[in-house]
């Protein structure tokens, strides 16, 4: 597996990497494990514990009770939240590992926001925020895109046993399938558009193998990071 470098190279590279990919493929576990191999690295998680607003919006979105209201609110909240997290943590003295990032939010919004006019507004907002991060703060040193087939996704989703996902799986099965079908290709396109070095890793590989592969790619970057 080769490190894939886009044709466009940005002016700024941030002091961070991102672990991204489809829902339930193990991003958080990999991010936390990887942090143990990079001196003083910190992980910025996708979901904060005890965030009642996130829990409410996530539940309402998956329940599909009022999609015209809650789906846009859900996407706007997550996008602005991740914008702030990236802005505040991407260039700290010590390396940061992000569990997903704003660069993935557009795809979720595309499949969640029903009204074209509302999505058009979101699309403009997302593009402005993403470009601001790229121009002012820099792109990640590496974007790890976890990939896996539908069976792996379904197995992992039920294994992690997040109640809101399990209870509403039938309502969201088509949504999950549509996301899964295009996720990796979309992320490749985003990385190429914004000039982000990336690699695609099979999520069904043992975590020891995945960590080894990521560390090998990071060492090729000649970063001023100390690996443990």
Curated annotation (Swiss-Prot):
Coiled coil feature spans: none
Cystine bridges: none
Matching InterPro entries: DCK/DGK, Deoxyribonucleoside_kinase, DNK_dom, P-loop_NTPase
Classification via CDD domains: dNK
Binding site for ATP: 21-28
Recorded GO CC terms: cytoplasm
Pfam families: dNK
Protein name according to UniProt: Uncharacterized protein MG268
Protein's organism: Mycoplasma genitalium (strain ATCC 33530 / DSM 19775 / NCTC 10195 / G37)
Higher taxonomy: Bacteria, Bacillati, Mycoplasmatota, Mycoplasmoidales, Mycoplasmoidaceae
């Amino acid at each position: 597996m080769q490190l894939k470098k886009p044709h466009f190279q940005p002016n700024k590279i941030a002091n961070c990497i991102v672990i991204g990919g489809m829902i339930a493929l193990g991003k958080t576990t990999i991010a936390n494990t990887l942090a143990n191999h990079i001196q003083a690295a910190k992980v910025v998680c996708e979901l904060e514990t005890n965030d009642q607003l996130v829990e409410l919006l996530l539940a309402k979105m998956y329940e599909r009770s009022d999609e015209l209201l809650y789906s846009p609110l859900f996407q706007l909240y997550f996008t602005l939240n991740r914008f702030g997290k990236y802005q505040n943590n991407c260039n700290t003295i010590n390396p940061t590992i992000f569990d997903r990032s704003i660069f993935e939010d557009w795809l979720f919004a595309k499949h969640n926001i029903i009204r074209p006019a509302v999505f058009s507004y979101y699309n403009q907002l997302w593009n402005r925020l993403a470009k601001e991060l790229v121009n002012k703060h820099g792109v990640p040193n590496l974007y790890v895109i976890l990939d896996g087939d539908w069976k792996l996704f379904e197995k992992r989703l039920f294994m992690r046993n997040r109640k809101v996902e399990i209870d509403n799986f039938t309502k969201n099965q088509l949504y999950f399938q549509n996301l899964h079908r295009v996720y990796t290709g979309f992320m490749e396109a985003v990385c190429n558009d914004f000039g982000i070095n990336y690699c695609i890793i099979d999520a069904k590989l043992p975590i020891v193998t995945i960590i080894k592969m990521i560390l090998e790619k990071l060492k090729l970057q000649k970063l001023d990071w100390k690996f443990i």
